Amino acid sequence: MKCPFRVGQGFDVHALVPGRALIVGGVDIPFSAGLLGHSDADVLLHALTDALLGAAGLGDIGRLFPDTDPAHAGADSRVLLREAYARVKAAGWEAVNVDATLICRAPRILPHAPAMVVNIAADLGMDAAAINIKGKTTEKLGFTGRGEGIAAQVVALLARAD
C-alpha cells in the first residue's frame, strides 16, 4: 500500500562566531555574531532541507551539497532549499506543512519569524499559514544556553503530488 503522506525531521546546529552575517530563515538578522559554516550557515533552512529530503527518502543536505565541494562555499541556503525541493517534487511529493523550532539564547526569534515564514513560503510555493516557526531557549543550559550557537529542529509533512 502506498501511503499518501510522509513525515521528515531535520536538525542542524552551527556555532556563533564574530565577523559573519547572521542569516536565519533567509533573513539577515542584525547581531554581534553570525553562524559558522561552509555556506551561509542558515541553520533553519539546513534543517528544513533535511526534513524535506528525509521525508521523500532522498538523503540529506550533506549528500546533496557536501561541504567538501568548493562550489557550495558561501552558498545561499535559499538556493539550496529550492534545488532540494525541486528534487522532492520530481519524486512526486509536495510540502503540506512545516513546523520549526529555533533554539538559542540570542537573538530573539519572534521579531524575525514572520519574514522567515514569508521566505520559506515563497521558496516552497506554499501558503504561509502552513508554516510555523518558534523560538526557544534552553534556560542558559548547554552551548545554546551559553550563546555559543543556534540549533534548529524542523518537522515537515509531505503529500503525494498526484
Curated annotation (Swiss-Prot):
EC number: 4.6.1.12
GO annotation, biological process: isopentenyl diphosphate biosynthetic process, methylerythritol 4-phosphate pathway; terpenoid biosynthetic process
Amino acids binding 4-CDP-2-C-methyl-D-erythritol 2-phosphate: 12-14, 38-39, 60-62, 65-69, 143, 146
PROSITE patterns, A to Z: ISPF
Binding annotation for a divalent metal cation: 12, 14, 46
Catalytic function, reaction form: 4-CDP-2-C-methyl-D-erythritol 2-phosphate = 2-C-methyl-D-erythritol 2,4-cyclic diphosphate + CMP
InterPro entries in the record: MECDP_synthase, MECDP_synthase_CS, MECDP_synthase_sf
Site positions per UniProt: Transition state stabilizer: 38, 137
Pathway in which this enzyme or protein is active: Isoprenoid biosynthesis; isopentenyl diphosphate biosynthesis via DXP pathway; isopentenyl diphosphate from 1-deoxy-D-xylulose 5-phosphate: step 4/6
Cofactor binding, per record: Binds 1 divalent metal cation per subunit.
GO molecular-function term, one example from the UniProt record: metal ion binding
HAMAP family associated with the record: IspF
Role description: Involved in the biosynthesis of isopentenyl diphosphate (IPP) and dimethylallyl diphosphate (DMAPP), two major building blocks of isoprenoid compounds. Catalyzes the conversion of 4-diphosphocytidyl-2-C-methyl-D-erythritol 2-phosphate (CDP-ME2P) to 2-C-methyl-D-erythritol 2,4-cyclodiphosphate (ME-CPP) with a corresponding release of cytidine 5-monophosphate (CMP).
Name under which the protein is recorded: 2-C-methyl-D-erythritol 2,4-cyclodiphosphate synthase
Organism: Azoarcus sp. (strain BH72)
Protein's gene: ispF
